[in-house]
Amino acid sequence: MTIILKNKHSLEVDDFKFKCCVGKNGISKEKIEGDNKTPKGNFKLEKLYYRSDRLNKPFTKLKCVKINKNMGWCNNIKDNANYNKLVNTKKKTKHEKLYRKDFKYDLIIPIKYNWQGRKLGKGSCIFLHLTKNYKPTAGCIALSKKDFLIMLKLISTRTKIKIF
């Protein structure tokens, strides 16, 4: 199955169309760290990370990982070893915290953009995550909790996302 994002407001999964939002500066083939753009292309999905203190384990065929207080995603363009990877927040490297006070990362699926042949500065922390108000993101794709939970029931470890 392929998740399709044809425009910045609609995510298609099987026969479902979900309202969504993307990066503040739209969708682009040319992506750099901090440009607020959602990367264009075909990508695999990582496992589901979720806040078990706020949600029960969702039904999905994806591998599920509980988010803890020490989880982050490295966005340090000078850290070749950890850039665009899951890191322990106790490491002395710049990162996006996954354990947040707000709800946005209660459910996240990292999109495997800039994973293989990782290039420093080409963008990191590109996730599917939650939103309530559909305000543009820093480059991620966000949808409502209700829609995210429906999507989780439909996708599997072989699902890809096509962004164009």
Predicted features by range, described:
Residues M1-A138, K146-F164:
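Cell wall/extracellular polymer interaction/catalysis modules
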Residues L143:
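A conserved hydrophobic position in a structured secondary element of the catalytic/binding core
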